[in-house]
Amino acid sequence: MSNPWDIVILGCGQLGGNLKTALEAEKIHVLGVRRTPVPDDSTFISLDLDVADAWEQLAQVPLAPNAVIVAIMTPDARTEDAYRQRYVGVSERLRQFVSAPGREHAVIWVSSTAVFGQHQSGVLDESVPAEPDHWRGYCLREAEQNIEQIQAATVIRLTGLYNAQSLKRLQDPEFRAQLDSKVVSNRIHREDAVSWLNALACNYLQKIPVPSLIHGVDMGSARYQEIYDFVDGVSSAIKPATVGRIVNSRYRDRMPALQYPTCEVVINSP
């Protein structure tokens, strides 16, 4: 029998793969679960979590008693049916999975701040109830509610993930035309998102108290126009947003310091 897994990452794509690498660097035994097979790598298994049989196969995988399950779901399409199948369906199956005797594992569920309704503005931290007003938000919130029924669980709502390459798109006039320049951009660098997920997983492994809800966001919420002006050299700094939809977290002091507290740091990098 193989050694039991310390952490299982359900939906081990780009973000999950980066998390897996970070955890393995700390000598943690990590299993990645994804639909697409990874040849010649026994630390991955191929399962379609939309199918009930996949969960029966997962139940046969040896897990450590304190194993942590991290779920990073991505829908196949930007439609209500696709979101409902992937987020609501998988969260319900995951809830059932960890409610079975002997499988009371901690769960980290990656959600999105898109759960907030478009009418919600001001500072939106973890104390503000989400009031979805669109099918996407409804599906995200329903999935969160499934996870909230798990005894040991954290929902982390990520804002827009970015890196240096994706920021370059902001120089493209056609890309800018797709965005409302007056809207506030709430983001977190991909490396910081991985760092926070890593910390949450390790805290659960070490029995360190973890918030049940946390927002993954940097400290640089700003209107797109302010970012454009900085990118174009019109301004010397990005002015933080004071009105509009400003996502924040009450738990920054319990998480690793951000390597990229604002996108200015990335834009100014060589």
Residue ranges, per PLM feature:
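NAD(P)-cofactor binding segment of oxidoreductase domains
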Residues: 66-108, 142
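C-terminal amphipathic/interface module of NAD(P)-dependent oxidoreductases
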Residues: 236-270
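Substrate-positioning beta->alpha
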Residues: 155-158, 166-168, 177-202
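N-terminal Rossmann-fold NAD(P) dinucleotide-binding loop
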Residues: 16-17
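Mid/C-terminal beta-alpha module of Rossmann-like enzyme folds, strongest
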Residues: 194-244
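Conserved beta-loop-beta element that borders a ligand/cofactor-binding pocket
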Residues: 112, 145-164
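Conserved Rossmann-fold cofactor-binding substructure of NAD(P)-dependent oxidoreductases
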Residues: 43-65
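Conserved Rossmann-fold NAD(P)-dependent oxidoreductase catalytic core, especially the SDR/UDP-sugar
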Residues: 95-133
